[in-house]
């Protein structure tokens, strides 16, 4: 192709800038599908589709590459404040998308839980799936994790739970 490493880095202002640009592009690609899934149909179905897409991506990648953003969070965010900020922003964007879908849901489907608390749970669960994938766990384990994760929408929040709808401590 004729592109040398130095000229590639120079085109982006350096190796670090190339990395950050790649991270941004990866995020945008992920959100094109994620937002579409969460905006179409029921909240439950949209959330299922997001999780199934992640499992499908894991299967296509042979289950060992993981997610660029999750891998960045695990490997680099602790030592790099700018990268940590971008990763947190990404996670917050995902959380916001889940919350928007859940906020459109009929109250009975939330089982008495706050949409934001559920969105945080789903965001953490999705990242956990990606870490498991990176470790090479079998797809069966990922599918089981998705089913159990989605089952939270089938069971009422425990009485006295801090994640119950209307709890002021749930910011």
Could you describe each region identified by the protein language model?
Residues 61-82:
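Amphipathic alpha-helical segments used for helix-helix packing
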Residues 24-30:
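Short, basic, alpha-helical segments at the C-terminal edge of helix-turn-helix-like DNA-binding modules
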Residues 79-81, 91-118, 153-165:
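Hydrophobic alpha-helical bundle segments that form small-molecule/ligand-binding pockets
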Residues 21, 35-65, 115-122:
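Hydrophobic alpha-helical connector segments
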Residues 1-17, 21:
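Helix-turn-helix
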Residues 41, 85-89, 104-123, 140, ...:
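All-alpha amphipathic helical-bundle segments outside canonical DNA-binding/catalytic cores
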Residues 57, 122-140, 152-159:
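Amphipathic C-terminal alpha-helical segment
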């Amino acid at each position: 192709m004729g592109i040398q490493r130095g000229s590639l880095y120079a085109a982006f202002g350096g190796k670090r800038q190339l990395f950050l640009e790649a991270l941004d592009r990866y995020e945008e690609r992920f959100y094109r599908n994620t937002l579409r899934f969460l905006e179409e149909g029921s909240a439950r179905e949209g959330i299922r589709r997001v999780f199934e897409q992640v499992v499908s991506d894991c299967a296509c990648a042979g289950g060992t590459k993981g997610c660029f953003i999750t891998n960045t969070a695990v490997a680099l965010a602790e030592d790099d404040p700018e990268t940590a900020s971008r990763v947190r922003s990404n996670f917050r964007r995902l959380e916001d998308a889940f919350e928007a879908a859940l906020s459109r849901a009929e109250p009975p489907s939330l089982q008495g839980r706050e949409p934001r608390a559920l969105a945080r749970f789903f965001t953490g669960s999705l990242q956990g799936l990606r870490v498991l994938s990176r470790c090479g766990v079998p797809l069966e384990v990922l599918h089981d994790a998705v089913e159990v994760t989605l089952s939270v929408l089938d069971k009422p929040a425990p009485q006295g739970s801090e994640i119950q709808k209307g709890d002021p401590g749930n910011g």
